[in-house]
């Protein structure tokens, strides 16, 4: 095992949500390493014993002060380590992302978010830093349109 392999510290499980309010998407600017300053969707680590859906609701509330209703599962996204996390480790991460609708509250940055805002869909796609996040946003819109238009 080479030095790079020995620095890999397990697999992290994160849960996030693409939140819609009309034609807008809720995004946050990360406040902590390794992604400080980058725009993304609200999300974070799954706590031991926590249901995935509950984690998505909690993360959105903690990072943005917004209450949501989950529409459905978008998918599971895999991020191989390219940067050290806040603890200095290289971490392989699985993100489980949901589509959601806004219920109440105005975005206010909290927890590890430095900023939170609803922005138009196209602006959200431009602002977010990760191609995986852009894919999650696009997939969430497709799911939302399927759920709201029905068969």
Report residues per predicted region.
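Acidic, metal-coordinating catalytic segment for phosphate/diphosphate chemistry
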Residues: 1-16, 87-89
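Conserved Nudix-box catalytic region and its N-terminal flanking loop in Nudix hydrolases
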Residues: 24-62, 66
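NUDIX/MutT-family hydrolases
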Residues: 97-99, 108-140
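Conserved hydrophobic "DFG−1" position in protein kinase catalytic cores
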Residues: 19-20, 27, 100-102, 118
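Active-site-adjacent beta-strand/loop module that shapes the phosphate/pyrophosphate-binding cleft
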Residues: 78-106
């Amino acid at each position: 095992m080479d030095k790079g392999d020995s620095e890999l510290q397990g697999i992290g499980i994160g849960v996030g949500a693409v939140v819609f309010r009309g034609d807008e998407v809720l995004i946050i600017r990360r406040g902590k390493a390794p992604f400080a300053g980058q725009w993304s969707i609200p999300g974070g680590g799954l706590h031991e014993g926590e249901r995935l859906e509950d984690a998505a609701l909690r993360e959105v509330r903690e990072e943005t002060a917004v209450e949501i209703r989950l529409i459905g599962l978008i998918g599971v996204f895999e991020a191989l380590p390219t940067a050290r996390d806040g603890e200095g480790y290289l971490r392989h991460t699985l993100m489980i992302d949901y589509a959601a609708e806004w219920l109440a509250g105005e975005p206010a940055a909290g927890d590890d978010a430095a900023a939170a805002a609803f922005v138009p869909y196209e602006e959200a796609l431009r602002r977010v830093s990760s191609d995986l996040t852009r894919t999650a946003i696009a997939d969430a819109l497709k799911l939302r349109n399927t759920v709201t238009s029905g068969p």
